């Protein structure tokens, strides 16, 4: 029981690593079309990502001209164990690359 709390929730780790890798995060509650949060603050993003049972996270970058490049999304389910929070993600996006790094 004690050991389990040491494992950082994979959803949180995904957001943390994405921010570290230069991504901006969009957090959506379950079926909302408007993001609950957009930015690079880990604690704010995680607060919104955990405000309901399921949430979606999108990763994007902006260049100097404010052009946005999308880098896919991930779907979080918070009832799952910490290693299983990231329930799904877009193929070829940041979350897939991230997930492959976790397995390595």
Which residues make up each language-model segment?
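Negatively charged, low-complexity tracts enriched in Asp/Glu with abundant Ser/Thr
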Residues: 2-45
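Acidic, low-complexity, intrinsically disordered interaction modules
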Residues: 28-104
């Amino acid at each position: 029981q004690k050991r389990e709390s040491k494992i950082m929730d994979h959803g949180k780790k995904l957001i943390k690593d994405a921010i570290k890798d230069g991504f901006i995060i969009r957090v959506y509650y379950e079926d909302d079309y408007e993001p609950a949060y957009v930015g690079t603050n880990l604690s704010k993003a995680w607060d919104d990502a955990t405000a309901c049972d399921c949430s979606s996270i999108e990763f994007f970058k902006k260049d100097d001209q404010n052009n946005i490049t999308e880098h896919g999304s991930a779907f979080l389910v918070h009832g799952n164990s910490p290693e299983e929070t990231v329930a799904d993600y877009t193929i070829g996006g940041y979350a897939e690359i991230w997930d492959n790094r976790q397995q390595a």
